[in-house]
């Protein structure tokens, strides 16, 4: 429930008819598959598939957009991973790390946090701008690849070494 996958489905409800060539693939939905499938059926959505937990690499290779609508995360590695494949992240701004990872409108989309709760219609408008504009989506994908390099193993390793040296010097 923490991942709030139903929010992605509600957002897709606004998009499916406008983008008939696109599909929503839900990966790693937890133990809530029956409820989520029921929700998809109740909304009459046709272009949704549930893949369960599998290695994300194959999905990153064929995806254009990844949506993460959790209420909270620590540092979601899935964002750095997907960005390294040129997948544009769309993230609900409900936790502090979002701004550290994504520059809204440049290398991803940040759905604004709303005190009244998640607004699927607002999210859909933001996602539609990326879905409907190949040039924008490709530019964001390239920027995402560049940003992801900040989170590479080599980059992180070098930062840890620098931190350890600073601690040792003190």
Task: Name each model-derived stretch.
Residues 129, 136-150, 162:
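A short, well-ordered alpha-helix in the C-terminal region of glycosyltransferases
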Residues 71:
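Aromatic "clamp/platform" in nucleotide-sugar-dependent glycosyltransferases that forms part
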Residues 88-92, 97, 102:
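Short hydrophobic beta-strand element within catalytic cores of glycosyltransferases
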Residues 35-53:
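Nucleotide-activated donor-binding/catalytic signature segment of Leloir-type glycosyltransferases, i.e.
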Residues 53-54, 59-63, 160:
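Short alpha-helical donor nucleotide-sugar binding micro-motif in glycosyltransferases
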Residues 1-14, 31-37:
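A conserved mid-protein helix/loop that constitutes part of the nucleotide-sugar donor-binding site
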Residues 153-170:
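C-terminal alpha-helical cap of glycosyltransferases
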């Amino acid at each position: 429930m923490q991942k709030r996958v139903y929010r992605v489905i509600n957002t897709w409800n606004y998009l499916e008819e406008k983008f008939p060539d696109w599909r929503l693939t839900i990966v790693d939905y937890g133990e809530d598959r029956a409820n989520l499938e029921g929700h998809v059926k109740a909304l009459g959505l046709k272009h949704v598939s549930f893949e369960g937990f599998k290695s994300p690499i194959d999905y990153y290779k064929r995806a254009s957009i990844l949506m993460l609508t959790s209420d909270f995360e620590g540092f979601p590695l899935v964002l750095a991973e997907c960005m390294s494949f040129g997948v544009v992240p769309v993230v609900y701004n409900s936790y502090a790390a979002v701004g550290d990872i994504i520059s809204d409108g440049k290398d991803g989309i940040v759905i604004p946090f709303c005190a009244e709760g998640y607004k699927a219609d607002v999210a859909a408008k933001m996602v539609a701008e990326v879905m409907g504009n190949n040039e924008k989506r490709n530019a964001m994908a390239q920027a995402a690849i560049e940003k992801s390099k900040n989170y590479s193993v080599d980059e992180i390793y070098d930062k840890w070494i620098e931190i350890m040296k600073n601690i040792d010097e003190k």
